[in-house]
Amino acid sequence: IFTKIKNIEELNLAIANSSKPVMLDFWASWCVACKELEEITFKDEAVIAKLQGFTLLKADVTANNEDDKALQKLYGIVGPPGLIFWDKDKKEVTSSKIVGYKNPTDFLQIVNKNF
């Protein structure tokens, strides 16, 4: 289950309060690849099992307001979907950054390298 965050402050607070690694999903209602991630990748049993070990956050950037733009700029996300990861020590794991749709196999291959 994803917890929605609206800005950098909420993101930082969520990361600080997490005892697990964190995954942030940049999402928008008009984003076809975001829907594919939700309907295919995030419903895969192996992916579900893997993500149980994470705090899951979602930034809905549909409105593309100033907070949305600031979050995307901070993490180099031009547009959704984008997935950013932090380890349990609250350090960003840039080698696990995912931009665009990934099927369950490719998603797990990237995430399993570091987690």
Language model region names:
Residues 1-55, 59-115:
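Proteins that catalyze or organize thiol-disulfide redox chemistry
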